[in-house]
From Swiss-Prot:
Belongs to the elongation factor P family. The lineage of its organism: Bacteria, Bacillati, Actinomycetota, Actinomycetes, Mycobacteriales. Involved in peptide bond synthesis. Stimulates efficient translation and peptide-bond synthesis on native or reconstituted 70S ribosomes in vitro. Probably functions indirectly by altering the affinity of the ribosome for aminoacyl-tRNA, thus increasing their reactivity as acceptors for peptidyl transferase. Its main location: cytoplasm. GO terms for cellular component: cytoplasm. This is Elongation factor P. It comes from Corynebacterium efficiens (strain DSM 44549 / YS-314 / AJ 12310 / JCM 11189 / NBRC 100395).
């Protein structure tokens, strides 16, 4: 059991018999009336998000979730194949297990997978990854109609917006949470 004061992003709760992960939360103390907590919860099985409001101080049942370090091996077209780094056991995860961040997965990348009662729930990539630019058009110095960015295709096939000075072959640091360009990595 946890109180609403213990809420943090990533915490997994049991709500109405379903496992739901806190994506966002906000403590609200209105001028009149009791304090409450607004949350955005994501169902770990279906991926659907719902908004839920809790009175401050309410006890909520939490789910025991273990996180294991794993290595991403490959995508067989219908699922991701991962290997536990300690036991070398292989696991299958559905293609939506990493959410939108799955487009940044590279073979042999280390990831974390969350388990509940022995069942794999979802995976998480590191906050940032280094990826090589496979293709991007040359940036023209005078071309500012696009706000100083251009599309670039990364080695995983993902397309992101990058500054005009980025060239094909550059290695970039990319934020896996929102797919944004962070910096160019020195080779």
């Amino acid at each position: 059991m946890a109180s609403t004061a213990d809420f943090k992003n990533g915490l997994v709760l049991k709500v109405d018999g379903k496992l739901q992960q806190i994506v966002e939360f906000q403590h609200v103390k209105p001028g009149k009336g009791p304090a409450f907590v607004r949350t955005k919860l994501k169902d770990v099985v279906t991926g659907k998000t719902v908004d839920k409001t809790w009175n401050a101080g309410v006890k909520v049942e939490t789910a025991t979730v273990d996180r294991r370090d794993m290595t991403y091996l490959y995508n067989d077209g219908s699922s991701y194949i991962l290997m536990d780094d300690k036991t070398f056991e292989q696991f299958e995860l559905p293609l939506d297990a990493f959410g939108d961040a799955g487009r940044f997965l590279l073979e042999n990348m280390r990831v974390q997978v969350s388990f509940h009662d022995g069942e794999a729930l979802f995976g998480e990539l590191p906050v940032s990854v280094d990826l090589r630019v496979e293709h991007t058009d040359p940036g023209l110095q005078g071309d500012r109609s696009t706000g100083g960015t251009k599309p670039a295709t990364l080695e995983t096939g993902a397309e992101i917006q990058v500054p005009l000075f980025i060239e094909t072959g550059n290695v970039l640091k990319v934020d896996t949470r929102d797919g944004s360009y962070l910096s160019r990595v020195n080779n």
